[in-house]
Amino acid sequence: MSVALFCGPPPAVSFGCKDGRGRKGMVRSKDIVRQTVKPPAHACRLIGWNKYPGSVVPTNSSLSPSPTALDDEIELDLSPFLIIYKDGRIERLKGTTVIPACPEVATKDVIIDPATGVSVRLYLPNVVDLPSKKLPVLVYFHGGGFVIENTGSPNYHNYLTLLAAKSGLLIVSVNYRLAPEHPIPASFDDCMAGFNWVVSHSAGPAPEPWLARHGDLTQILISGDSAGGTVTHYVLLRADAGVIEGAALVHPYFLGSKRLENQTEEDFEFHEKLWRLSTPDTEGLDDPLINPLAPGAPSLAGLKCKRAVVFVAELDFLVERGRMYYDALVKSGWGGEAELVHQKGVGHVFHLSDYSGDVSVDMMAKMVAFLRGE
């Protein structure tokens, strides 16, 4: 097990989505990973949407492009997330850096499904003083639009290290497969598998000693931000009754076919394009996987938890969808306790890159209080 010290937030990066300006002013991350994996056929068909400025690099048919020029031809541009080139490369522009598992709390990675490569990263707070104490368990699903990020991303690793230290919970972060190489529902299936893997430790031999020795499996909570919030809802509908104590949905990535007043046309079209790339068999933005309030979607009365909190941010493209979800949950006849936390002056997942600001500190305090049941 590798050991390191939690060093605070990563260097600030200018991402428009974090300050309410959409994608304006975006800069590319320096940590670019080029993957020589041919994307699925559906990803290439999306080039028909050539109404987005800059999404395709035109070529001169009268010239024979050099290998270098061909390498740079773009099939589909989904900045600031990823770019797909005509030669099959996928270039992820952010969310690719991986830092080793490390404690201030103890951390380690465990592969839970060798066939798919799905793994989890565990965060165990200091239990030296109380070695026999059982800790509530939080299963966490990271965000990234289903196409970027991982459990080793600096933002997520640092945030969950801090959350484990402050809350005293044993955290299990699920590293699911990403689209477009692994189209949805792969990510949903992987997260459900990660959740079930944790639950399995309550019945019979436990393969993971940290969970067996230190996890209170009568106190399981789940949470996720952005796309991870979408997955959290998915798991809540499919878990066995009585297993999940509470759920925290942070800036959940819920969409819909109707553009809301706070959503620009540019952002709306971008996220529709991203969803169709990730989910080739989708019927659109009213797919119940991404729109829990769509006609035919399962009733929110069926959520399998006792308590739920929904965090929304004033400058977030998704703020109204989050509020609508909360309102629908309250009116659904669901028998649990629901809470809405609306934070002003901040944008989407601001808390992952700013730990010291007043709003971030307040959000952490509210999250810790919820997880502890205070």
From Swiss-Prot:
EC primary class: lyase
Cell location: Plastid, Amyloplast
An example Gene Ontology biological process: defense response
InterPro entries per record: AB_hydrolase_3, AB_hydrolase_fold, Carboxylest/Gibb_receptor
Expression tissues: Highly expressed in pistil and bulb scales. Lower expression in stem, and barely detected in root, leaf, petal and stamen.
One GO molecular-function entry: hydrolase activity
GO cellular component: amyloplast
Active site, per annotation: 226 (acyl-ester intermediate), 316 (charge relay system), 348 (charge relay system)
Protein's UniProt keywords contain Nuclease: no
Pfam families according to UniProt: Abhydrolase_3
Reactions that this protein is recorded to catalyse: 6-tuliposide A = tulipalin A + D-glucose
Chief location category: plastid
Listed EC numbers: 4.2.99.22
Sorted UniProt keywords: Amyloplast, Lyase, Plant defense, Plastid, Transit peptide
Complexes and interactors: Homodimer.
Other notes: 6-tuliposide A and tuliposide A-converting enzyme, which are compartmentalized in the vacuoles and plastids respectively, come into contact with each other for the enzyme reaction releasing toxic tulipalin A upon cell disruption by pathogen infection or herbivore predation.
Family: Belongs to the AB hydrolase superfamily.
Function: Lactone-forming carboxylesterases, specifically catalyzing intramolecular transesterification, but not hydrolysis. Involved in the biosynthesis of tulipalins, defensive chemicals that show antimicrobial activities against a broad range of strains of bacteria and fungi. Substrates are 6-tuliposide A > 6-tuliposide B.
Protein name, per record: Tuliposide A-converting enzyme b2, amyloplastic
Gene: TCEA-B2
